[in-house]
Amino acid sequence: MFTRIALFLATNLAVLILASIVMSLLGVDSRSMSGLLVMAGIFGFGGSFISLLLSKWMAKRSTGAVVITEPRNQTERWLLATVERQAKAAGIGMPEVAVYEGPEINAFATGANRNNALVAVSTGLLHNMSEDEAEAVLGHEIAHVANGDMITMALLQGVLNTFVIVLARVVGGIIDSALSGNREGGGRGFAYFIIVFVLEMVFGLFATMISMWFSRHREFRADAGGASLAGRQKMIAALERLQLNHGQSTLPTQIAAFGIAGSTAKKLFMSHPPLEERIAALRASTVA
């Protein structure tokens, strides 16, 4: 699927599990709300920002993307010139530009801030899209960077992680107390940890729905930004080209990918809106 979910959520899931272990070892009492909030905040935001800070390295390593330092051909020269022009128009620093091997038509942007980003495109995109269509895709990715989508996503995920950690322990303590007959609450038996683990999984699903809703919202904004930088008709043409190429992506995540989630995915868990909705939104917009 064309998603940005797997690595990012895997990192945050690992943090949730680690938080459970560490808080248990440190004896953090779920009845001590201040201590719980502090620990949940540290672990909740920790995973998000570690993932964000490592996002460029992870993206390069997982896709095999090669950064263009000295253009070797006309295509690479065009890529650098186009990204430089769009970055200047968007008011951001020049991102690193990379190409990775992949048959799918796709591109992504990632990085910890607006002036230290990475924009990469697949060889499938370069082989199957016209320059006008590719220009629109690059504009879409530059818009992600200019909008600060990566840092905003990390902040949102940090809040959601913290919420999941706290709520799972508070509700888990209540359930464990009710089951054990301990009216003072805060049971620390094996059942308590099982309950908390299950609740983290359940609440984590709801948190994922929220983060994916935000992801879909930001795709519309990035489409509008791409239309402003490259032209609305070019942006529409790029999306229409994607409709003709529904191949499966091998992209990992924590990257702002241009594609869409697989057609079999439930809409609540889709990181991108359906292509027809994105095209309709562009047709209804006032961007030239």
From Swiss-Prot:
Where along the chain is the active site annotated? 141
Q: Which cofactor does it need?
A: Zn(2+)
Asked whether the keyword Cell division is assigned, the reply is no
User: What topology in the membrane does the UniProt record assign?
Assistant: Multi-pass membrane protein
Question: Which positions in this protein are listed as binding Zn(2+)?
Answer: 140, 144, 219
Q: Where in the cell is it found?
A: Cell inner membrane
So where does this one cross the membrane? Answer: 5-25, 34-54, 155-175, 190-210
Read off the HAMAP family from this record: Pept_M48_protease_HtpX
Which protein family is it in? Belongs to the peptidase M48B family.
Its protein name is Protease HtpX
